[in-house]
Amino acid sequence: MQTLSNGTRAHEYLANLSDLIQLISGLFMPAFFFVSGLLARNAIIDRPWKRIATSRMTNLFYLYLLWGAIQWGAITGISTEITGQRISQNINAAYAGTFSEFLTLTFLAMSTSWYLYALGIYFLLAKLFQRYNLPLLLMAAVLNYLAVEKIIPYWGPQSLAQYFVFFMLGTFWCSQILRLSEWRRQNGLPWLLLLLLAGLPALFDFDRSLFLSVLAILISVAACRGLNQVSSMAWLNWIGRHTLPIYVLHRIFIEYFGMTAILFAQRHQLFALAWFSWLWACLYPLVIVALCSLASVAVWSLTNHGVGRALFRFPTLIKRPAYPAA
């Protein structure tokens, strides 16, 4: 009975941890797309179509399709080899049962690497309508509301609609956001106003506030600025340079290491042990993230040579310097 109680508490802890991760992810993604828009700003505003069509949009769509197919094949193979059956019912291109289902889910951005698809679409729209950036921002804000309230169906289209507004802010209003993120007296009133606006949607039972996401962006920028003042941030820069291989490869390693570890623990009835359940609940998320990240970088280091470079960069860009950027 005591073992069952401990196991239940560990399960509740994992459930609460999952909810926390979902909340953090919901606030992290706006910051990611804001920074992506900031980095794409010069290409969108100053560079001609001829110079950026392949290096930006074509490259992003190419990587999205390529790694979507690789993940689908690898995850299907891993699931079949280890369990002999499909164990996930997630609506995701990586778990598609047929080729037509894979294509449909990929087109709908219901793929693990959906953010590559989103960046390509955002870049295209921002470039096309850069002279009408304010109306485009307002449209993006409306799309954000429709996505958050799930008026737009399916999680893939919802994701595409939800984060466009933050890419727009990074592209066309980054200077204002960066100034607002500084700890200055004159920024006190705007911050207070944002705090009030961030809490207002709760009165109307909205799922998530656009203003709360903007606050998360400001806090993230301010935190990074503060850390950069007291540390070299070399480790964070290293992670940033390897974001693409870590992101596209980690899903495959999560399936392999995760399923292998879970099946091993079940086979030896380790989850019946209270100490193991708590150890698993506390350490597994950290260990699996570190293990998958290191494995992803290792594979990238081994394959990012010669023809293998086409796994991470559109073939016609291989001879050009610079790592694929958002």
PLM region spans:
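Solvent-exposed interhelical
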Residues: G120-L143, F172-P190
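Alpha-helical transmembrane segments of multi-pass integral membrane proteins
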Residues: D205-R309
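Interfacial loop-to-helix transition and helix-capping segments at the boundaries
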Residues: L17-M29, L103-Y117, E149-L169, G199-I219, ...
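Membrane-interface junctions at the ends of membrane-embedded or membrane-associated helices
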Residues: A43-R51, R131-Y132, C174-N187, A223-W238, ...
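Alpha-helical transmembrane segments of multi-pass membrane proteins
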Residues: M1-N6, G73-T76, I252
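Juxtamembrane membrane-water interface segments that cap and precede transmembrane helices
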Residues: R9-N16, I91-L105, R267-W278
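Transmembrane alpha-helical segments and their boundary/interface "anchor" motifs
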Residues: Q22-A31, A43-T80, N90-T106, W238-L249, ...
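Aromatic-anchored segments of alpha-helical transmembrane domains
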Residues: M1, G68-A69, M139-I152, W191-D205, ...
